[in-house]
Amino acid sequence: IWFETFSDLGRILPVAEWIRSMGDVFIMASFSVNVFGYTKTGLSMSELIRTVKGSGLIDGIGFNCGTGPSHLARLLRRQDLGDLIVSAAPNAGYAEQIGNRMFYRDNSGYFCESMREIAELGVNIIGGCCGTNPAYIKMLTQTAGKAPAVKRLTDRPEQRAESEIRYD
């Protein structure tokens, strides 16, 4: 189960505890932080990471939206991620307002190079949020997908994801 784009753990932890009471389920929680590494509710990345590690309820932590890739790389570089599974899905950059619309310039090269830096930090799951599109992700697999694996987490066969598509 993946909780995405949250600003604190207040609503996640009670639900994660309930989910855990039902069985062994992989739980990921992703947060949106600003360029200084804080959520809208004022929690720092290091506080979120420390709480997630200490809770015993959440298997992985992620950061999505809120920042561009180079800011997120800088923030992640300063964190003690330990053995957590970590995801990073920043925005393509920062949107510009033109009239009544928000636009992201095509900066897929910059995005992918910054994401390669993130992958080299040992982040397990990488992707994109606002302003990215399938072309970004395709380029990302070609660029950051070649980054060497920096750290390997202990294999947890009991938590391997299985998927099934059903059309009932």
Each language-model region and where it sits:
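Domain-level signal for soluble alpha/beta catalytic cores
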Residues: 2-168
